[in-house]
Amino acid sequence: MAAGKEIRGKIKSVENTKKITKAMEMVAASKMRKAQERMRAARPYSDKIRNVAANLSQANPEYTHAFMESNDAKATGFIVVTTDKGLCGGLNTNVLRAVTSKLKDLQAAGHDALAVAIGNKGLGFLNRVGAKVVSHATQLGDKPHLEKLIGPVKVLLDAYSEGKINAVYLCYTKFINTMRQEPVVEQLLPLTAAHLQADKDQHGWDYIYEPDAQTVIDDLLLRYVEALIYQAVAENMASEQSARMVAMKAATDNAGSVIGELKLIYNKTRQAAITKELSEIVAGAAAV
């Protein structure tokens, strides 16, 4: 029964793996709910800033912030948001494939690329492909804080304000629902009219701003861009936990199938061994 013993060992091993994947599935489900709550809680903040900035910009059309001006620089910035850990299906692969496609288009046009990596997976990828990583933020944990993002991202924002890069793209995985997440590569800078469009139900504004509207616009647009980046990180984290939960559920289900197949093989092997022993006993009795 050496074969039977080996099969029992495999069954035990797969059962242990199944327990691990089931536990990871439950942990991911809990984290997913919390990540979705953070993602939804961040939206009203960015929406309110956008409305205020939009109304201010419309009231002061003669003033154009640096984030709204285009330039002819031969370099482009990328903020690449990925996960710190794996075991989340093709989440990182899909967004990095989209980044690779965009990088190839820029290289074909003769443009350089400067990147900020948020997450270990993106940092490792950008280093492997030889991209110029100007800063990075990793180990953000389950609760991302804007303070950890501002420093690394500010490098690209300052470069755009100084005319060193012609655009900044935000690359992340957008959360659609628990079963669906989409890789996104969207233009962050320069800000367009679509970015600064007030809600239709907003009433006319007649406020006095101190020290002046221009200073308020400068501060609000920076906060708005930071809020968009934070929202992308929050969406990516919700997508990560959803993808991990689905991946671990699939692994748990597959482990169950493997266990069933191994038990069937074990039973057949055991039955064959018993049949063989009985045949030998009968043959021995017949010989006597």
Curated annotation (Swiss-Prot):
One of its GO terms (molecular function) is proton-transporting ATP synthase activity, rotational mechanism. It is found in: Cell inner membrane. It is a peripheral membrane protein. Keywords: ATP synthesis, Cell inner membrane, Cell membrane, CF(1), Hydrogen ion transport, Ion transport, Membrane, Transport. GO terms for biological process: proton motive force-driven plasma membrane ATP synthesis. PROSITE patterns: ATPASE_GAMMA. It comes from the Bacteria. Pfam families: ATP-synt. Signal peptide: none annotated. One of its GO terms (cellular component) is proton-transporting ATP synthase complex. SUPFAM superfamilies: ATP synthase (F1-ATPase), gamma subunit. InterPro entries: ATP_synth_F1_ATPase_gsu, ATP_synth_F1_gsu, ATP_synth_F1_gsu_CS. Produces ATP from ADP in the presence of a proton gradient across the membrane. The gamma chain is believed to be important in regulating ATPase activity and the flow of protons through the CF(0) complex. Belongs to the ATPase gamma chain family. F-type ATPases have 2 components, CF(1) - the catalytic core - and CF(0) - the membrane proton channel. CF(1) has five subunits: alpha(3), beta(3), gamma(1), delta(1), epsilon(1). CF(0) has three main subunits: a, b and c. This is ATP synthase gamma chain. It comes from Polaromonas sp. (strain JS666 / ATCC BAA-500).
